[in-house]
Design a protein with these regions (language model features):
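Short, flexible loop/turn motifs enriched in small residues
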Residues: 58-65
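A residue-level signal for conserved active-site and pocket-lining positions in enzyme catalytic cores
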Residues: 20, 151, 204
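Conserved hydrophobic/aromatic positions in well-ordered beta-strands
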Residues: 67-69, 205
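Anionic group-transfer/hydrolysis microenvironments
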Residues: 55-57, 109
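ATPase catalytic-site recognition across NTP-hydrolyzing enzymes
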Residues: 1-54, 68, 180
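Mg2+-dependent endonuclease catalytic cores in nucleic-acid-processing enzymes, primarily RNase H-like
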Residues: 72-183, 226-230
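Acidic two-metal-ion nuclease catalytic site recognized across multiple nuclease folds
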Residues: 33, 78-79, 174-183, 193-230
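Helicase P-loop NTPase motor core of nucleic-acid translocases
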Residues: 94-97, 103, 118, 189-200, ...
Length: 230
């Protein structure tokens, strides 16, 4: 049933091969997504530009992970194991109450999030993201590649990662250029083979960068411009 849900929701044939069969079409050599990226050693600030990402559990030992970040760092990471719709929705509601004005993005791939989405939509705006949907960037294969590209740019710009588990997931994540010239992120199942667990936290973090409008605050943007031209 779970496989059928993904098959029906992922329309891109290449993405379907990646998600269901762990296969990437003819490609060049793999590259770590953090290659040539310098990770910041310290957090450079804080603000109230809060964004939430929710990666939904799909199979077996996968967990639902909720990440909240501001423009500078991760402020919450909540893993939920074998959690039902009510439990997940309740955690989201608590975070909304805590952080007030917050933008929310949820993994809608395969329809696993439908119950949570319906509950949260009663009182709050929530954006469902199908990882296999069309990319906004013409050089990326799909929305998942868009999100990770934006995440890497943020890290290179000083976004602080102080969670070792997320660092491990990031370093285990690579990309390739497909035979049609698109950037594709390695499928979760292949990353899971390296780590021994699914990179759910990193996918939740990447979701917070789905929209470039939620990347950094205006204050942080001005700081980065100052660094570039000093």
């Amino acid at each position: 049933e779970s496989v059928a849900l993904i098959e029906s929701s992922v329309t891109d044939p290449m993405m379907r091969k990646q998600e269901l069969e762990g296969e990437i079409m003819e490609t060049t050599v793999e590259n770590c997504i953090l290659a040539d990226v310098t990770m910041s050693a310290v957090c450079q600030g804080t603000d109230s530009n809060y964004v939430m990402g929710i990666d939904m559990a799909r199979y077996g030992n996968d967990s639902t992970v909720i990440i909240v970040r501001d423009s500078y760092r991760i402020v919450e990471k909540i893993p939920l194991f074998h959690a039902d719709t009510y439990t997940i929705s309740s955690e989201i509601e608590k975070l909304i109450a805590k952080y007030k004005k917050i933008r929310i993005f949820i993994d809608g791939t395969g329809g696993f999030s439908s119950g949570v989405e319906d509950y949260i939509k009663l009182n709050h705006e929530i954006t469902s993201v199908n990882f296999g949907s069309k990319a906004k960037d013409e050089y990326n294969l799909n929305a998942r590649a868009d999100m990770y590209t934006n995440l890497v740019k943020a890290i290179d710009g000083g976004f602080f990662i102080d969670d070792n588990a997320i660092k491990d997931e990031l370093f285990a994540t690579s990309y390739v250029i497909t035979n049609n010239g698109k950037k594709a992120i390695k499928p979760k199942e292949q990353i899971k083979e390296i780590l021994g667990h699914s990179p759910d936290a990193t996918d939740a973090l990447a979701l917070t960068f789905y929209s470039t409008d939620t990347g950094i605050s205006r204050e942080r943007e001005q700081q980065l411009i100052g660094l570039l031209f000093r």
